[in-house]
Amino acid sequence: DPDLVTSLPKSITADTGMDVLTHALEAYVSNMASDYTDALAEKAAELVIKNLKECYDNGSNKEARERMHNASTMAGMAFSNAFLGINHSLAHKLGAAYHLPHGRLNAILLPYVVKYNSEEPTKFVSFPKYEYYIADEKYSHLAKKLGLKVDTIEEGVNSLVEKIKELNEKLNIPKSFKDAGIEEKEFLAKVDVLADRAFEDQCTTANPRVPLVSEIKQILLDSYYGK
């Protein structure tokens, strides 16, 4: 399989690779997550962090390509059982509206969604598989496994967010929707509809934090301006 993608354009390597990371992180904190999906998601995230930049820089590195394929499969196994979250809800609607690559949209959104999900929810999900809110703890635990600085849960979350931003930058992924070429006036005219539609997306139901439409709109605005 690695032979099939050695000539893949760098931008597609970056976009699809960040989609894999998004699959892993969303499955990891899903309200349907289990011990099985956690193990798959953790390993998938680790493989992406260690191998995606090498695939981007040196597409002919078959070992790195193989590990990214493994990561993609494991992340797929994780989210096919635990489902996804609002990162994909938003990317689905933005992709339909602006025809930008799905993985690129996920990559731009991911730091903002991780930060959002790490905060105490306005209300809990209807059928949580845990007794208290643990998304922030899980993000921090993953950050520790990735070798990031984690003296507190909050620091672990922030370290993970910064690692995602750093990887995006190394892959030449835009920092914001504005940088990705979405025209401001058009975006602001559509943002309320996009927020409503993202709220109704099937992925929203598995997000660890049940979002208000107003909160989804704020994520969109933050992601547009790169705040």
Residue ranges and their predicted role:
Residues 1-82:
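Carboxylate- and glycine-rich phosphate/diphosphate-binding segment that chelates Mg2+/Mn2+
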Residues 32-40, 55-67, 82-87, 153-157, ...:
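Flexible, glycine/charged-enriched surface loops at secondary-structure junctions
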Residues 73-106, 201-206:
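Glycine-rich phosphate/pyrophosphate-binding beta-alpha loops
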